[in-house]
A protein has these predicted regions:
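Single conserved hydrophobic/aromatic residue that forms the stacking wall/gate
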Residues: 1-5, 9
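Alpha-helix C-terminal capping/helix-to-coil transition sites in glycosyltransferase folds
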Residues: 4, 18, 102-103
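Conserved C-terminal guanine-recognition region of P-loop GTPase G domains, centered on the G4
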Residues: 11-80, 188, 205-234
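Conserved nucleotide-binding/hydrolysis micro-motifs of P-loop NTPases
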Residues: 28-31, 57-62, 87-91, 157, ...
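Canonical P-loop GTPase G-domain recognition
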Residues: 60-112
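Conserved G1/Walker A P-loop phosphate-binding module
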Residues: 95-186, 190-199, 204, 233
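Conserved P-loop NTPase catalytic core
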Residues: 177-182, 223, 228-229, 239
């Protein structure tokens, strides 16, 4: 493999060796970006790490319909999602999260304002007193190494670690092949068999089963737009 590809592989190995779960936090307010969630899920899939999507701020009425729709879509394509209220129901939220994070090293990611810090403080109350600064390469292409903080919960009432990524906002996925993308997007891949051409990229080709599924309402239009944004940069055709 090329040097760049080798570097990506090493980053993937490093991440997989240290992290057991990727936790993606979002909330109805401030306005969340579904593409951030989807990019994080794709990155976790590519790294071979299980992912848990955490919908926070469930107590908010504003934007609740959009957040609930996002949860339904994620669940419909097989993703693991839980809904919590770190501020409204802190004890219940903590118990539910500990149940999922027990015994694991969990990476916490999310857009600014989604309540990630509140969740971190619920999980590791002594977080500010016991931090270890380090850099973690999120195996997502160029310029993705970010400062991260590792918090051990062994002194509390549960065993595990939480890795926070303050200020981390973007996942670069330019290194992914079309096969990588399709493997991580089963809702798109399910319709590939209907394509007229074996090397269809599901972009502008005639007789595309994926585009037909979008037109028939069988594939979410926003998901297809997300797929297109990645596929135009993909470096290989499907096998």
């Amino acid at each position: 493999p090329s040097s760049a590809a080798s570097d990506v592989y090493k980053r993937q190995k490093s991440l997989a060796a240290n992290i057991d779960l990727v936790c993606i936090v979002f909330a109805s307010r401030p306005t969340f970006n579904p593409w951030f969630i989807w990019r994080a899920l794709l990155a976790a899939h590519q790294a071979g790490i299980p992912a848990l999507v955490i919908r926070n701020k469930a107590e908010l009425a504003e934007g609740a319909e959009e957040a609930a729709a996002a949860v339904r879509l994620l669940e419909s394509i097989g993703h693991d999602v839980i809904t919590v209220s770190a501020t409204g129901e802190p004890e219940a939220t903590r118990a539910r999260l500990i149940e999922r994070l027990e015994g694991r090293a969990s990476l916490l990611v999310g857009q600014s304002g989604m309540g990630k810090s509140t969740i971190l403080n619920l999980l590791v109350p002594h977080a500010q007193a016991a931090t270890r600064e380090f850099s973690v390469a999120l195996n997502l292409g160029k310029q993705t190494t970010t400062a991260a903080r590792w918090y051990d919960a062994k002194d509390d009432d549960w065993q595990g670690s939480v890795i926070d990524t303050p200020g981390f906002q973007e996942f670069g996925l330019a290194h992914l092949s079309l096969n990588d993308i399709l493997r991580a997007m089963p809702d798109i891949a399910a319709h590939v068999s209907g394509c007229r051409f074996f090397n269809c990229r599901h972009l502008e080709e005639p007789g595309c089963g994926v585009k037909a599924a979008v037109e028939a309402g069988e594939v979410d239009e926003a998901r297809y737009a997300f797929y297109r944004s990645l596929a135009v940069h993909a470096d290989t055709l499907p096998l």
